[in-house]
């Protein structure tokens, strides 16, 4: 999608923001370190609490990115097999925790009741669009596994926040990420 930015046109920012989309398949073309640096400059212009920018960025490209992806995919393979397995496989997974990387924040909470229908609708539309039936667990797992290949993106960025600042640092990182994405 190409966007013709005309800042002289009234409502251009709303039009630009409405053009946002999600990408699930990236080109393998490498991104130059100079372009990454330019994007990080924009990333760092976001406001933050006391202008402290309580986050760090780790960037993986090339062989390092591929090693991380391979490790994440290996863990996803173990986790998805255990989730489809019997109770013993699930207990073994919890005891060994050969699953996905951990986080300071729980990301597996269920949506609140009023948001759940929208979440389910969007998920259903995505899987219908890419031709995966609800009952096709194998293809659904394969599609989910693409998260751990970063959807083929040649650059992966990991954002780390200062845990002592709790949600405040996460908010600040979110603002910076919006700059990066835009």
PLM region spans:
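Acidic, surface-exposed loops and disordered segments
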Residues: 1-182
